[in-house]
Amino acid sequence: MSVVGFDFGNENCLVAVARQRGIDVVLNDESNRETPAIVCFGDKQRFIGTAGAASTMMNPKNSISQIKRLIGRQFSDPELQRDIKSLPFSVTEGPDGYPLIHANYLGEKRAFTPTQVMGMMLSNLKGIAEKNLNTAVVDCCIGIPVYFTDLQRRAVLDAATIAGLHPLRLIHETTATALAYGIYKTDLPESDQLNVAFIDIGHASMQVCIAGFKKGQLKILSHAFDRSLGGRDFDEVLFNHFAAKFKDEYKIDVSQNAKASLRLRATCEKLKKVLSANPLAPLNIECLMDEKDVRGVIKREEFEEISIPILERVKRPLEKALSDAGLTVEDVHMVEVIGSGSRVPAMIKILTEFFGKEPRRTMNASECVSRGCALQCAILSPTFKVREFQVHESFPFSISLAWKGAASEAQNGGAENQQSTIVFPKGNPIPSVKALTFYRSGTFSVDVQYSDVNDLQAPPKISTYTIGPFQSSKGERAKLKVKVRLNLHGIVSVESATLLEEEEVEVPVTKEHSEETTKMDSDKASAEAAPASGDCDVNMQDAKDTSDATGTDNGVPESAEKPVQMETDSKAEAPKKKVKKTNVPLSELVYGALKTVEVEKAVEKEFEMALQDRVMEETKDRKNAVESYVYDMRNKLSDKYQEYITDSEREAFLANLQEVEDWLYEDGEDETKGVYVAKLEELKKVGDPVEVRYKESLERGSVIDQLGYCINSYREAAMSTDPKFDHIELAEKQKVLNECVEAEAWLRGKQQQQDTLPKYATPALLSADVKSKAEALDKFCRPIMTKPKPVAKAEAPQAKGGEQADEGKSEPEQPASAEPMETENPAEGST
C-alpha cells in the first residue's frame, strides 16, 4: 500500500513518499524535486511537467499553466477574468458557465476542462511516485489551499479519479505545514499551548494559519487568506514596469506578443530573486521583439515603491487570523514563514513589524507541504506505524442548511418563507456529522449553502438534496432524521434521511419486571422520538432556535409526543412502543460539479491520451535506437570490426548505413514505431554476424583453456595412484579416460578447422559449443570421480561378559537411521 503526499502548487509540484526510514521528497526524471505544473499539447503527444516547461517558449498558446487558478471557478468570477488576461492560452466560457481551455492537440482544436488538465498533471506526478517506489500508487493525500470552495474540492477529487488516485484526505496546505512542523518536535509543552503562526506566501496566494501545539497534538485555531497575493504579483509589477519602459524607449508593445511576454515574465522572476539579495539588478534580453535587444535596471527601493499596492494588503489576513483565533500578537510565540514569495525583503519587514519578532525559516519553504501531506497519508494508512499525533482541523467557512415546506404545501403557496439554520459554523472541527429532524407529509428538498460569501466570491448555493418519496403509515406528517456530514476533505453533503415511526407492539409483561422493562423501553422511545433531545439531535435545537421551522412550522408541536412517553412511564402494563426506522431515498444535485458519467468519460480520454504519449515515447526510443546503431556500427567497422568483414561487404554496409542516416533526417523523420523496428532489424541482419565473429574471437581462447583444464583434471584423477581413488573401479576410471580422450579429440579437430579460416569467415568453433562440451564432460566425470568411499560396517562384539557386552553396546556411533536392535541383541543374550 502506497503512502504518498502531493503538493500541487500553482507553479510547481512536489511528491513526497513515506518509507520505513522517514519521509523523502522524490526526484523526477530530470533529477529535480520540483516539477513544473504545466501541460503542453503537441501535434502528436502531450508534454507534461519539465518537458512541458521546456516546450512553453516554442508553443505558448498550447501550454496550460496555473491550473489551480482555473479549477472549480465560474467564468464570470472577477478574479478569474483578471487571471485570464495574463494567460497565453485561450480560455472561454463553457455551456455550464465554467471555463473551458482550448488547445491544438493531434492537429485539431480541442477543449478541456481545468479538472481534466489537473488530472493529467496528477497522472504525471503519480508516475514519478511509482518509479521511485517500484509499486503502484493509489492511496495518497493531496494538499489544497484553505480557501478552496466545496466545488473546487470536489473538482480536485474528480481530477484524482481521472489520474487513477484515491485521496485519503484533501488537507489544507497550512495544516500540512503545521503537521510537518509539530510531529518531530520533542519539546512541546504538555499543558500550556504553544501558538505558532504559519505564513505561506506562494506563487499566487497568501495563507495564514495559527496553530496551537501541545505534546502529541495540534489544533488549528484560525485560517485567513488572500487569494491574489503571491510571488507572481511581484513578477507582474516588474513586468508592467518594464513593458511600459520598453514601449517608450524601444517602441515595442510586449503585451501584444505571447512569446515576448513569456520571456519578459521569466526574466522579471529572476530579477525579483536578484533584488532579494542585492540592492540593484540589471535586465538584458536579446531579440525580445522585432529583433530588438532591450536593457534596463531597477533598484530595490524602486521595486518596493511600485509594489506598495501589494504590500499594503499583507496585514489584512494577519489581523483576521489573530481575530478569529482570539489571540493578540503577544500570544503568538513563533512565526514560521514559507513559500517562494516570502523571500521578498519587504514582506519579511512587514511581518517583523506586525508580530514584533523576526519570522523563522526552520522549515524547507518548498518541501514542507508535501512532507506534511505524506505524513497525513501515513497516519491514515494501516500499513505505517506513526508516532501518535492528533490533528484537530477547523473548517474555514460557515455552512447552513435551507429548506421550504413540504412539496404539497409549496404548490398551495404554503411555504413561501425560506427557513435556514447554520449546521457547521466557521471553525467547526473536521470531520463532523450533524442531524436535523423534519416533519413532512411528502417529498421535500434542502439546500446546502454558504452562510457568508463575502470572502468567497462564489455562488452561495452548493448543492440541493431532494428527500423522498415516503409515506407515513398513520397518514400524518412523518418524522424524518436528516444527517449532514462534513467529511475529511472539507466537503459537505446530506448523508442520509431516515423515516422514524412509532408503532405499538403487544408484549406480555410479567409483574415482577414490568416496571423496569417499560421504563427502559420508554427511555429508548423518548430518546429517538423527541426532536430536541439526545446528542445526535442537538442540531435540532439549534435549528428550532434559529428559524423555528422543523417543529411548529409543520403544524406538529414538538411537545405533542411527550405525554405519550409519560403515560408509558407510569403504566407498567402498557403496550411496548418501538421506533421503526426506514431509509428514505434522496437525490443529489451539486451545482457546477462533473456528473459520474462525465468523470468516467474523462477517465477514458485520459487513458487514450496516455496511450498515445506512451506510443510516441516508444517510437522515439526506437528511432533513437536506429540512429545510435548507425553511428556506433560505422565507427566499429572502421576500427575493431575491420578484420571481421570483407572489404566489399564493409563498403556495402557503410553505404547502407549512410542511406539509413539520410532517411532518418528526411523521409523517415516521422514514421511509426514498427517502421523503425523493421529498419533496425534489417541493419542487424548484416551487422550481427560481424559482431558475433568479433566476440567469438575474444571469448574463444578463455573457454578453450577452461575445457583443457577440465580434461586434464579428470584425466589426472583417473590415472592417479592416490589412495583416495582406490575405491573407484578400473572400468569406471577407464570410462572417464575415454571421455577425456573424446573431448580432447573433438577440441583438436575443431581448433584445426578454425585455424584454417580467416577472421571474416563464419566460425567453425563457437565458444558456446566449447562451454557445452565442458559442461557435458563435467556432468559425466564428476559423479564417478567424487564417489564416496563405502562405509565399513561395524563388527558385532563377542559377548564374553557383561562388561564386554556393555562396551560393545556403547562403542558404535548410532545415526538416526541406525538399527539399534543388532547391537542390543548380543547384550541381551549374555545376561
Curated annotation (Swiss-Prot):
Tissue: Constitutively expressed.
Keyword vocabulary terms for this entry: ATP-binding, Chaperone, Cytoplasm, Nucleotide-binding, Nucleus, Phosphoprotein, Stress response
GO biological process, one term: response to heat
InterPro entries associated with the record: ATPase_NBD, HSP70_C_sf, HSP70_peptide-bd_sf, Hsp_70_fam
Induction and repression of expression: By heat.
A single cellular component GO annotation: cytosol
Modified residues (Phosphoserine): 533
CDD domains, per the entry: ASKHA_NBD_HSP70_AtHsp70-14-like
Bias type Basic and acidic residues, positions: 509-526
Recorded phenotype for the gene knockout or disruption: No visible phenotype.
Subcellular location: Cytoplasm; Nucleus
Region span, Disordered: 503-579, 786-831
Main localization of the protein described in the UniProt heading: cytoplasm
Function: In cooperation with other chaperones, Hsp70s are key components that facilitate folding of de novo synthesized proteins, assist translocation of precursor proteins into organelles, and are responsible for degradation of damaged protein under stress conditions.
Family assignment from sequence similarity: Belongs to the heat shock protein 70 (TC 1.A.33) family. HSP110/SSE subfamily.
Complex and partners: Interacts with HTT1 in both cytoplasm and nucleus.
PANTHER family: HSC70CB, ISOFORM G, HSC70CB, ISOFORM G-RELATED
Name of protein: Heat shock 70 kDa protein 14
